[in-house]
């Protein structure tokens, strides 16, 4: 999902930094889930997000798996580390949006995106959800962001519906950020 959003942002004219947050879960817990372990192994060399990355950006698209209807602890930890930047007002007036994935259709996708946005309210950020601004949103059905159901084994591939929704979200975020920047 993140790679698709990054590519769509670039196609919309943005300079993009694709980052991940540091993995904080113990290795034995990760090893107990084959899909998670594989993901960690394939992304281990990707750059971890820093405060400088969010300061650099005019717009931020956060992606997180859903954990019990909430933001994953790794992303929450990154957001919590931005207290100094928040206190200095450096996170305000940026565009923010989110995307998520769950194993089940009612696995907390909307509550996760809403919880993610709680920090953005405190930042003074500008949340740019997709809403129902394009007919394709009636197919994916999530006005708060984009969500994907991975299935019980976390292996369900993204569909054209989700690819289109991710493209729309990224394009919308880039467009609105550009309008705000002038």
Q: What is the predicted function of each stretch?
A:
Residues 143-150:
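Mobile gating loops/cap/lid regions near enzyme active sites that modulate substrate access
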Residues 92-143:
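Short, glycine-/small-residue-rich phosphate/pyrophosphate-handling segment
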């Amino acid at each position: 999902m993140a790679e698709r959003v990054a590519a769509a942002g670039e196609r919309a004219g943005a300079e993009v930094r694709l980052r991940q947050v540091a993995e904080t879960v113990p290795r034995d817990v990760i090893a107990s889930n084959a899909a998670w372990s594989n993901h960690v192994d394939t992304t281990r060399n990707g750059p971890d997000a820093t405060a400088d990355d969010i300061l650099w950006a005019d717009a931020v698209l956060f992606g997180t798996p859903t954990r019990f209807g909430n933001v994953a602890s790794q992303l929450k930890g990154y957001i919590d580390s931005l207290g100094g930047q928040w206190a200095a007002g450096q996170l305000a007036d940026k565009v923010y949006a989110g995307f998520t994935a769950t194993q089940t259709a009612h696995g907390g996708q909307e509550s996760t995106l809403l919880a993610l946005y709680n920090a953005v309210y405190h930042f003074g950020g500008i949340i740019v959800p997709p809403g129902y601004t394009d007919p394709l949103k009636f197919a994916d059905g999530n006005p708060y962001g984009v969500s994907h159901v991975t299935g019980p084994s976390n292996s369900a591939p993204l569909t054209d519906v989700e690819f289109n929704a991710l493209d729309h979200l990224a394009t919308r975020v880039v467009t609105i950020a550009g309008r705000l920047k002038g």
